[in-house]
């Protein structure tokens, strides 16, 4: 892995990536944490940092050197609403990438963070190697009222920006695959309900790849934090579960779906993915589920464990079914 003997602080302090460095993990000041002074080799021993972070940072440097990589939507769409939402552009070197859907990548973080460091840049680098252009979305978190509605607006703003700049990015703006992790996995699923693409008159994704996603409010039977529910949904959880926030009950608008998770997930019950898969099967929507025997929550690119290479398998599956679509 590149930079394995460099500290995280030195790598994120590189002036080339100054606009994005503070959002390596949005809403966390990493410079105040012990991991700031750890090398990437040392970080790999910690579960949530086990992926190929060095490859992601190397690819980020390469993108930054082009000068055509970082797009704060508050600036580019001239919106009076200041949200801090932005996309980072990782183009693939594959000449056929222009003809393929781009990947719209949404890292997770429990709706309080956005983990670009592990679930954004390294994953985008892998999709680039598979011949796909990638946009990485950094979205609003820590909302106090209807955050998920705001996140759907984040999606719409980003996708409209991309569609409006097809020539600049050498792609077809109406052809895209969504991929999201954990909370980001919930968002890419929610985008396929009536709250998502249809509400914004935007095209349906070609496919969706949720990775260890939350999908169901009814599965979360623990004690409810009313402030959290109001911040996410604008209502209490029981009321939200009667709406399309309960994704398996509103799955008719989904594209083909490939789900990836680990059996030993300690944070998100694997039943979230299985429940969605059963709902898609009832709708006769193509779906596969890959459940790793190990890896837990937050395995990201799956390096060093049984989930390694899942991005390639997702693409291979998508290409196998797209030939028949």
Regions found by a protein language model. Name each.
Residues 213-249:
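Mobile cap/lid helix-loop segments that gate and shape the active-site cleft of serine hydrolases
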Residues 253, 259-261, 265:
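Short beta-strand/loop motif that positions the catalytic acidic residue
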Residues 217, 264-268:
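Acidic catalytic loop of the alpha/beta-hydrolase fold
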């Amino acid at each position: 892995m590149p930079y394995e003997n460099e500290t995280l602080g030195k790598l994120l302090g590189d002036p080339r990536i100054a606009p994005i460095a503070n959002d390596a993990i949005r809403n966390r000041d990493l410079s105040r944490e012990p991991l700031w002074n750890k090398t990437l080799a040392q970080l790999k021993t910690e579960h949530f940092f086990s992926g190929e972070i060095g490859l992601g940072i190397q690819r980020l440097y390469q993108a930054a050197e082009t000068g055509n990589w970082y797009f704060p939507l508050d600036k580019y769409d001239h919106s009076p609403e200041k949200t801090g939402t932005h996309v980072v552009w990782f183009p693939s070197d594959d000449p056929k990438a222009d003809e393929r859907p781009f990947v719209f990548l949404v890292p997770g973080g429990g709706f309080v963070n956005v983990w670009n460091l592990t679930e954004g840049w390294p994953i985008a680098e892998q999709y680039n190697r598979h011949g796909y252009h990638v946009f990485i979305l950094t979205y609003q978190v820590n909302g106090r009222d209807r955050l998920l509605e705001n996140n759907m607006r984040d999606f719409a703003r980003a996708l409209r920006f991309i569609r409006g700049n097809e020539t600049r990015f050498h792609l077809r703006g109406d052809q895209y695959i969504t991929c999201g992790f954990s909370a980001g996995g919930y968002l890419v699923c929610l985008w396929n309900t009536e709250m998502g693409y249809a509400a914004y008159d935007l095209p349906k994704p070609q496919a969706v790849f949720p990775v260890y996603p939350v999908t169901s409010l009814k599965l979360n039977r623990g004690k409810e934090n009313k402030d959290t529910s109001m911040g996410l949904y604008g209502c209490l959880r029981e009321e939200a579960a009667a709406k399309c926030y309960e994704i398996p009950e509103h799955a008719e608008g989904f594209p083909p779906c490939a789900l990836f998770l680990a059996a030993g997930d300690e944070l998100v019950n694997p039943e979230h993915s299985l429940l969605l898969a059963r709902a898609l099967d009832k709708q006769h929507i193509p779906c596969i589920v890959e459940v790793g025997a190990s890896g837990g929550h937050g395995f990201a690119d799956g390096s060093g464990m049984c989930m390694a290479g899942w991005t390639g398998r997702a693409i291979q599956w998508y290409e196998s079914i797209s030939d028949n679509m």
